[in-house]
């Protein structure tokens, strides 16, 4: 190993050690020469004593000088180098501390001036870039909003079937306890066979615009999804196409398939239940009207009775099937859940736009299942047909059992049934002549009738089969970033798998995590009470992929621990146990490098529960304590507070000593350490691992 690869402090130590050895060698040589020159054997003891004293004095002086050099030159230079490297490679903008380099002459002030100039230049550049990128950021936000609310799930995958993009609808469609994550295999969420076959078909075709329709099922709950796959064309070359990724659009057709199966079953039952009595009736009627039929009155009476019985069976079957048809018909039409207040406002606006007078909507806090556009057109049509002679019109939406009642009230003359039927037979203004009020009622499997109220008021009643109250969810499920699109298109250009040790750091997927516990001693019965984690993919933290949950430790939480992290026994009383949480966390961290601040402490708690969890936490691990020592030197403070302060990261007071707050702070520190590591030539995982192993003693001291 060349001297240039050794640390500055070690090289200075070796220099003074060599100086000490040289002095001792010169002293010994001088004493030996003097003794032989004197040629008096009795003087040997004097030479030995004198040489020993002189040697110790030399070693002491050189040791003191080395200690002063180490404390006032080597360490400050190492600290100064780490600070400069942090400022040149990361976004640290705090002033450089000159006090540590007070014995370095003009070096520390010069370094501080360089850092200040760098900050000013960087700020000016940032402002210029910010001005130029504001418009692009707005366009990006608009595009993300658009893609987050398209009515289908959208996945973008690499040729190796790793996720590069997904939107909010895709998260809902894929379902399951484990949300999608960037750089995860799509086969974790969808059964692979249909996707592999469709991908192979598209790769084999020569048409760059070809698409493949397929049916696939979710791994979590077996829902059937209709999908369309299209390759991302990057050229006509066959090899380029083979390396291209693909877009997969998803739509849940489980309800459509159930509705289709229900219709098929109803039709089969219809023919089965009608065929036999109809055939029997045909035979009986043929016998009764035949000229050579039975002349005996008793026989003819029996035939007529049998015909009546078959007719009764037929009528009963028709009525039963009609009722089932009415009950199922609403499921055969795409109906959406719409707020009653929005429905009332839409009717009011349409009535006003058509000049049909005033209408007061009075709605309950309900979600209504209906075809909003056609139902609004129907109610507006009825208001218009009521005319100006009927005053004080009011639209009420009331809860009615499992459904709702839409009531159109007015003061004035009643509506005759014949007039109402005429109104319902008229076409509605929806752009299709065949859409009438009666058809809208049929789609919703409902009817409309008039009722008389008190004091000269009347109303038309229209019940809806399905509605539900709107209220706060007593157990809301937090969504880290609602309806968000999550993507990293750089993953498309990433090469294939390589050995972990040779993989560049910015190509790895990291899961940064932290735990809160009942105490500091896993061997003494302390347990985890909270786990939080975030994912870093392609060198950036994915905002929408967060793991954060309380854990029921199955034991009391000491007051001293609660004073640190704020977690009480009441907060974890209904939380899941470590067995369930551990399995979920293992899935979240699957295939990633684990990162933590003082990782041995957190991992010890998890590894002691591996048998209970049923999973082994054998992921590769990096520790930000050791990475800090690599960048800033072992002599610096390496607590999380010291590291974040050194890197210019602010931890909000309310987030301090919480699992998620410390996790986010550790992740930000880790991201700022990566450029500093690369500047030292540590670009691969193996190189970093080799370097951090030199600081193993520091980790042992921290956990002693």
UniProtKB/Swiss-Prot annotation:
Residues 139-192 form the PAS domain. GO terms for biological process: DNA replication proofreading. Disulfide bonds: none annotated. GO terms for molecular function: 3'-5' exonuclease activity; DNA binding; DNA-directed DNA polymerase activity. Keywords: DNA replication, DNA-directed DNA polymerase, Nucleotidyltransferase, Transferase. It catalyses: DNA(n) + a 2'-deoxyribonucleoside 5'-triphosphate = DNA(n+1) + diphosphate. Residues 511-704 are annotated as: DNA-polymerase III epsilon chain-like. CDD domains: DEDDh (cd06127). It comes from the Bacteria. One of its GO terms (cellular component) is cytosol. Pfam families: RNase_T. Its EC number is 2.7.7.7. The keyword Nucleotidyltransferase applies. InterPro entries: DnaQ (IPR006054), Exonuclease_RNaseT/DNA_pol3 (IPR013520), PAS (IPR000014), PAS-like_dom_sf (IPR035965), RNaseH-like_sf (IPR012337), RNaseH_sf (IPR036397). PANTHER family: DNA POLYMERASE III SUBUNIT EPSILON (PTHR30231:SF41). In the C-terminal section; belongs to the DNA polymerase III epsilon chain family. DNA polymerase III is a complex, multichain enzyme responsible for most of the replicative synthesis in bacteria. The epsilon subunit contain the editing function and is a proofreading 3'-5' exonuclease. DNA polymerase III contains a core (composed of alpha, epsilon and theta chains) that associates with a tau subunit. This core dimerizes to form the POLIII' complex. PolIII' associates with the gamma complex (composed of gamma, delta, delta', psi and chi chains) and with the beta chain to form the complete DNA polymerase III complex. This is DNA polymerase III subunit epsilon-like protein. It comes from Rhodobacter capsulatus (strain ATCC BAA-309 / NBRC 16581 / SB1003). The gene is dnaQ.
């Amino acid at each position: 190993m060349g001297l240039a690869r050794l640390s500055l402090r070690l090289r200075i130590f070796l220099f003074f050690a060599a100086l000490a050895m040289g002095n001792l060698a010169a002293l010994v040589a001088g004493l030996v020469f003097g003794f032989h020159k004197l040629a008096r054997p009795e003087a040997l003891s004097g030479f030995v004593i004198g040489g020993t004293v002189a040697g110790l004095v030399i070693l002491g002086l050189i040791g003191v000088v080395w200690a002063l050099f180490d404390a006032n030159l080597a360490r400050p230079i190492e600290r100064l180098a780490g600070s400069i490297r942090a400022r040149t490679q990361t976004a640290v903008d705090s002033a450089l501390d000159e006090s540590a380099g007070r014995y370095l002459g003009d070096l520390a002030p010069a370094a501080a001036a360089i850092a200040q100039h760098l900050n000013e230049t960087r700020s000016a550049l940032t402002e210029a870039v910010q001005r130029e990128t504001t418009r692009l950021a707005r366009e990006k936000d608009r595009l993300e909003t658009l893609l987050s609310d398209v009515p289908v799930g959208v996945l973008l995958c690499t040729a190796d079937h790793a996720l590069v993009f997904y939107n909010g609808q895709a998260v809902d469609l894929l379902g399951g306890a484990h949300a999608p994550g960037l750089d995860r295999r799509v086969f974790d969420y969808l059964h692979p066979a249909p996707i592999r076959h469709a991908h192979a078909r598209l790769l084999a075709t020569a048409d760059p615009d070809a698409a493949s329709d397929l049916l696939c099922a979710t791994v979590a709950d077996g829902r059937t999804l209709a999908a369309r796959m299209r390759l991302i064309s990057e050229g006509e070359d066959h090899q380029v196409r083979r390396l291209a990724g693909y877009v997969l659009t998803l739509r849940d057709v489980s309800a459509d398939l159930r509705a289709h199966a229900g219709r098929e079953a109803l039709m089969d039952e219809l023919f089965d239940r009608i065929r036999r009595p109809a055939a029997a009736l045909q035979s009986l009627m043929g016998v009764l009207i035949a000229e050579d039929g039975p002349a005996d009155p008793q026989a003819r009476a029996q035939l007529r009775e049998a015909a009546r019985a078959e007719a009764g069976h037929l009528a009963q079957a028709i009525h039963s099937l009609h009722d089932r048809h009415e009950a199922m018909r609403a499921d055969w039409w795409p109906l959406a859940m719409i707020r009653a207040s929005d429905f009332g406002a839409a009717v009011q606006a349409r009535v006003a736009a058509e000049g049909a007078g005033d209408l007061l909507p009075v709605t309950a806090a309900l979600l209504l299942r209906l075809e909003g556009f056609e139902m609004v057109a129907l109610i507006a049509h009825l208001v218009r047909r009521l005319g100006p002679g009927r005053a004080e019109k009011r639209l009420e939406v009331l809860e009615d059992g499992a459904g709702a009642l839409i009531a159109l009230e007015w003061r004035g003359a009643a509506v005759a049934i014949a007039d109402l039927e005429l109104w319902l037979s008229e076409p509605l203004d929806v752009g299709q002549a065949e859409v009438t009020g009666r058809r809208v009622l049929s789609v919703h499997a409902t009817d409309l009738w008039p009722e008389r109220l008190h004091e000269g008021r009347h109303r038309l009643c229209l019940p809806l089969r399905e509605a539900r109250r709107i209220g706060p969810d007593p157990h809301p499920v937090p969504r880290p970033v609602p309806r968000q699109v999550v993507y990293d298109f750089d993953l498309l250009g990433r090469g294939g798998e390589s050995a972990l040790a040779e993989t560049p750091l910015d190509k790895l997927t990291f899961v940064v995590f932290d735990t809160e516990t009942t105490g500091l001693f896993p061997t003494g019965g302390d347990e985890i009470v909270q786990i939080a984690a975030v994912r870093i993919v392609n060198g950036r933290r994915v905002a929408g992929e967060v793991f954060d949950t309380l854990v029921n430790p199955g034991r009391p939480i000491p007051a001293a621990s609660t004073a640190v992290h704020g977690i009480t026994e009441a907060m974890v009383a209904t939380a899941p146990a470590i067995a369930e949480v551990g399995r979920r966390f293992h899935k979240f961290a699957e295939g990633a490098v684990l990162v933590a601040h003082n990782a041995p402490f957190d991992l010890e708690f998890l590894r002691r529960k591996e048998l209970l969890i049923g999973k082994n936490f054998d992921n590769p691990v990096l520790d930000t304590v050791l990475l800090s020592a690599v960048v800033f030197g072992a002599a610096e403070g390496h607590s999380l507070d010291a590291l974040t302060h050194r890197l210019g990261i602010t931890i909000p007071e309310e987030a301090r000593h919480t699992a998620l707050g410390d996790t986010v702070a550790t992740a930000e520190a880790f991201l700022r350490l990566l450029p500093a590591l690369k500047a030292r030539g540590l670009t691969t995982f193996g190189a970093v691992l080799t370097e951090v192993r030199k600081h193993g003693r520091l980790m042992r001291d921290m956990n002693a």
